[in-house]
Structures are given as structure tokens and as C-alpha cells.
Amino acid sequence: MAKHVVVIGGGVGGIATAYNLRNLMPDLKITLISDRPYFGFTPAFPHLAMGWRKFEDISVPLAPLLPKFNIEFINEKAESIDPDANTVTTQSGKKIEYDYLVIATGPKLVFGAEGQEENSTSICTAEHALETQKKLQELYANPGPVVIGAIPGVSCFGPAYEFALMLHYELKKRGIRYKVPMTFITSEPYLGHFGVGGIGASKRLVEDLFAERNIDWIANVAVKAIEPDKVIYEDLNGNTHEVPAKFTMFMPSFQGPEVVASAGDKVANPANKMVIVNRCFQNPTYKNIFGVGVVTAIPPIEKTPIPTGVPKTGMMIEQMAMAVAHNIVNDIRNNPDKYAPRLSAICIADFGEDAGFFFADPVIPPRERVITKMGKWAHYFKTAFEKYFLWKVRNGNIAPSFEEKVLEIFLKVHPIELCKDCEGAPGSRC
């Protein structure tokens, strides 16, 4: 009888894991559970907020797609996990038994600053991005000060930088940039830290970009409150300061959703309810449970004065998904080989008229290679990659062999590595 793998989550991590499993093992029973009926291309959510993309341009409906690849799709919220009984219970009360479980839910958003959820905007979901788009129309009609940034505990800083620079470009195009003072406030110890201690010359590059575009910045502070007309932050000396604001966009922090917490403290990290995994992204206690994506508990790479987390970018998530799929299939086939993701990353930050290209191998130091470049070519590269990735989703193969070969030739990157000892922190070398 075929083994049954249940994947919770229909984002990059869930889709990539399901497709990798299907391509590695055609007779495997796979069920994907997601409360969203679509796959959304997260890196394009800033563009959706700016009105540069339509929702249908960057999303793919899952119900007609997944059955084509013999993957059952359940469009419901997963309510709870019983790791001892090997079951997932959905919102309707349906109990689904599994042999292996992959948790790729994505995070629960935590709007930790007072008034953040009510008075600010976000670009972390398609729905939030569309709401932000409406708020921007109000700003264009009645310009005033803009404040963008990240609250304490954030691990995903890139979109905030991208959004600030894209908004500068849009305001300039509309001829109203001179009416909009812009300030960037972040919990990072310095600009371009990104939660990973910087990537090459990222500090200098981002500081130069902001200086050239007249965007003021305040780093190493904790945003405490966001009110309709101002942002209140606290410095390291405990002093509070205010910055006037007509429009704000602040990245929230992340924690694991309730379904992860329901599995208990051996699956959910008590501190943040993220999935506890080892180097091979397997839960150390329940060996048939794996984590993929933002919901995995990767420890911070360094202690910062204001708490920051480690980002999990698209390329990192694809590598997690590939490693997990190989590990599940090898376990089914009684093959002792285990794999860990390399956790290297290509990040392209779109600035509107040009873009920044960042490559870190691996993301978690010490690194073997780092590349930071900037130019109009990177802007077009990101647009092309968006279309390419959505093509991969529609065609049931997130990891085509030619892509792996291209990365190996040009960047000397191998997405996964054979791991003789999985019992270590995720991201640590085997």
C-alpha cells in the first residue's frame, strides 16, 4: 500500500515539497491542505501593493491544478495536529491520517507595535498588499510624510527596503516626491543587516541608495506604537521619539500558527511556535514530521541589541523542500542517505527603475561566496524570474534539472548536501 504524505501549506514550501515528492516517487499518495485556494508569488506582493501587478498575474488557482499531478487538494484550514496518532484535523472536523507530515504553513503575522494592525499597512499577504494599494491612492491624492520599516523581532526585512525604494520611484513618476518626506525605521543594528549580519557590501550599498534618494533612516531602535499621524520609537537608552506620518508600512514579526502549536512543545518551539527541526529539517522527536519554509525554527545568527530573526528566502525554501522530499522518499525506500539544504540565497530587490542583486552561499555565516550587484538588468531579471517561477508552478516541477545545472555552472551552488549527522541546528554544516 502506498505511503501517504500530508503537506500543510500551499505557498512556495508546500508546493515545492509536493512537486518534488511527486517527481521522485510517482506512486506516492500526496495530500496538500491549504486554507487559501490559490498559490501566490510572494516576492511580487510589493508590486501588487504598488499597483504594478494584478492579482491574477501573480497567482495560480490550486483546485484545478494539483489533481493534474495526482495531488489531492483540500481547501480548508488545518486546525490541529496529533503527532502521536499521526493525524491532522481540518476546520470541518475531517481527520486525515498520514505516514509523513510536512508542515509548510507559513507564519502567523504578529503586529507587535501598539496600533500597528489598525493604523499601518503590510505587504506580507496578497490581501494586505491590495489593502495597501488602496491606502497609497489616498496618499497620492493627499501627500504627506511616509514612514516604512520593521518592528522588533522581524526576520523578513527585504520587502520593506524594496517597498520604500519602489514608492520613491512611483512618487517621483507622479511628480509629488517633493511633497513626501520619507523615513525608514528598523530594528536592525544598521541598514542592510537583513537579519544575517549583512551580505557583502549591503550596508554601504543601501546607505548610498537611501542617501541618493533622500530617504532618512533610523536604525537600531524599537518601534513601540504606530498612530494615525505618527510613529513612536524607543532608542537603546530608553528614550522615546516621534516621527510624523500620513502613511506607514511596517513589516510584522512572525511566529508559528495555532496548528503548529497544537502539536505540542516537542514539535512547536515554545518561544515562537515555529517547527523544531534539525539540519535535515526533520523533527528530532517525531521522525515522520518535517518542516519547510518560514515556519521552521532557525535560530538567530547573532545577538543584536534589538531582536532580529533569520530570513527564509524563496531559494532557501526551495532547497528545504528538495532536502525534505529526498529524505522522505529515502526513508520509504529504506535508503539511509539523508540530505540537508545548502541554504544559499539569491535575492533580487526591485527599486522600480533598477534593482539590487544579492547572492550569499550559504546565507548563514561563515560563507563561501558573496555577490552584491546593482543595475537595470536586475530589475528585468526579477520580472523574468517571476514569470519563470509561475511557469514552474503551473507545470508541476519546481526543480527542473536544467535549473540545477545552470546554478552549478554559474554560481557553483548545489541545493542539497549529503548529511551524515542530521542532529544539529538547522543551517549548521553537516
Curated annotation (Swiss-Prot):
UniProt superkingdom: Bacteria
Gene Ontology CC terms, in alphabetical order: membrane
Broad EC category: oxidoreductase
Needed cofactors: FAD
Signal sequence region: none
Coiled coil regions, renumbered to chain: none
Chief localization: membrane
Record localization: Membrane
Topology of this chain in the membrane: Peripheral membrane protein
Catalyzed chemical reaction(s): n a quinone + n hydrogen sulfide + n H(+) = polysulfur(n-2) + n a quinol
Active site (catalytic residues): C156, C347
Residues holding FAD: G9, G10, G11, V12, G13, S34, D35, R36, T42, P43, T105, V294, G314, K382
Pfam family, one: Pyr_redox_2
One record GO biological process: aerobic electron transport chain
Cysteine disulfide links: C280-C422, C419-C430
Protein name in the entry: Sulfide-quinone reductase
Species assigned in the record: Aquifex aeolicus (strain VF5)
Gene from which the chain derives: sqr
